[in-house]
Amino acid sequence: MSAATLEQGLAELGLHLSPATQARLAAFATLLQKWNRVYNLTSIRDAGQVVTHHLLDSLAVLPHLEGITTLADVGSGGGLPGIPLALAAPDCHPALAVTSIETVNKKASFQQQAKIELGLANFTVVNERVENVRPEAKFDAVISRAFSELLDFVGLTAHLLRPGGRFLAMKGVYPRDEIARLPAGFRVVEVHPLTVPGLGAERHLIILERN
């Protein structure tokens, strides 16, 4: 993995992360590639693309997490975006704690190992189907890159949120048709086009709330 690519990408995103944090992000990328050879955590195997498509894509949402202290990452697979966000949090959002909810055992096992190896005190792994999770304290927000349909995202995760909590959907092209299919009781409150360095594709962060 190119540390220079990561450093340049962070600068283009306007993120000022310490050298120690950048080193931990690089260590996570190495760990992801190592486990991916056996566990098939991601289809992306090129080291440079791991930086752009996974690390920088995940971190592009950081400026939009103001006011959020508890964040649930649903269906994060290899820990994306949850682990990069947890790694960067001490430099940008010191109060942020991330909980990853992952159904697949091998993916949850990888995330737990990453937590241990990277010393992530602000990251928790829950190996369970999202609909079965009943948190003691509900979350400020829930985020996901995994859902192909906003309808499913809000339907399966609404019970995780505190009153006034937000859904953060990381999408590619603007999901006009998906928004039109949202059930009554949910609305889009913010749309943020994201420019991810090195990723030649549209990205949007769609923020939703209950009415």
Swiss-Prot record:
- Where does it reside? Cytoplasm
- Family assignment from sequence similarity: Belongs to the methyltransferase superfamily. RNA methyltransferase RsmG family.
Q: Where is this chain primarily localised?
A: cytoplasm
Taxonomic source organism: Aromatoleum aromaticum (strain DSM 19018 / LMG 30748 / EbN1) (Azoarcus sp. (strain EbN1))
Provide a GO CC annotation, any one.
cytosol
**GO molecular function list:** rRNA (guanine-N7-)-methyltransferase activity
Task: Quote the catalytic activity from the record.
Answer: guanosine(527) in 16S rRNA + S-adenosyl-L-methionine = N(7)-methylguanosine(527) in 16S rRNA + S-adenosyl-L-homocysteine
- Cytoplasm keyword on record: yes
Q: Which EC numbers characterise this protein's activity in its record? A: 2.1.1.170
What keywords are annotated for this sequence in UniProt? Answer: Cytoplasm, Methyltransferase, rRNA processing, S-adenosyl-L-methionine, Transferase
Biological function: Specifically methylates the N7 position of guanine in position 527 of 16S rRNA.
Which residues are S-adenosyl-L-methionine-binding? 75, 80, 130-131, 145
Protein name in UniProt: Ribosomal RNA small subunit methyltransferase G
